[in-house]
């Protein structure tokens, strides 16, 4: 099996996520796997170790910046609203979106990569034309996009480089 250059956040921090999920006593918003407080702890770390199954676990700090920004992101997502991270290159937008997705949905890889060539089909769904011809329009012939998968499963969809997409794509999402 090939090893990934950079494993997904949910693989890289699997143990921390498991500890937080299983020790979390807070209320989880719908489709969240842990409470907003546990999501904050996952990203900003814990000052005290967490006891789980007879062991002590220290949740490491993953984001070094403005803690209030993390809290605003979590509150926005808990309010069932979209979140757009905007900033200069290298300001940890992708890293933060991966951490939030892994903590909230358990998956950080449900992603659309925006380019100048991104079309509406790429953000909704497309068709497996061989199956479409053989069986007609059916769920089996449909190839869902990450956005479709996110809506179907109730998980976050990350949209990288949305500003590179054509204006009509941006307008349809915003």
Annotated model-derived regions:
Residues 2-174:
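AAA+ P-loop NTPase catalytic core and its hallmark functional loops
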């Amino acid at each position: 099996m090939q090893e990934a250059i950079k494993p997904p956040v949910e693989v890289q921090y699997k143990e921390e996520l498991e500890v937080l999920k299983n020790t979390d006593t807070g209320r989880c918003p719908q489709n969240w796997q842990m409470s907003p407080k546990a999501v904050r702890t996952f990203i900003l770390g814990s000052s005290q170790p967490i006891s789980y199954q007879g062991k002590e676990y220290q949740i490491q700090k993953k984001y070094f910046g403005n803690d209030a920004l993390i809290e605003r992101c979590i509150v926005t997502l808990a309010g069932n609203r979209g979140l757009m991270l905007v900033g200069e290159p290298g300001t940890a937008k992708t890293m933060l979106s991966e951490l939030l997705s892994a903590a909230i949905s358990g998956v950080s890889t449900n992603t659309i990569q925006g380019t100048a060539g991104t079309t509406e089909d790429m953000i909704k769904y497309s068709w497996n034309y061989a199956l479409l011809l053989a069986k007609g329009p059916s769920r089996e012939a449909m190839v869902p996009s990450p956005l479709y998968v996110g809506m179907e499963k109730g998980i976050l969809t990350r949209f990288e480089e949305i500003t590179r997409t054509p204006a009509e794509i941006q307008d349809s999402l915003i």
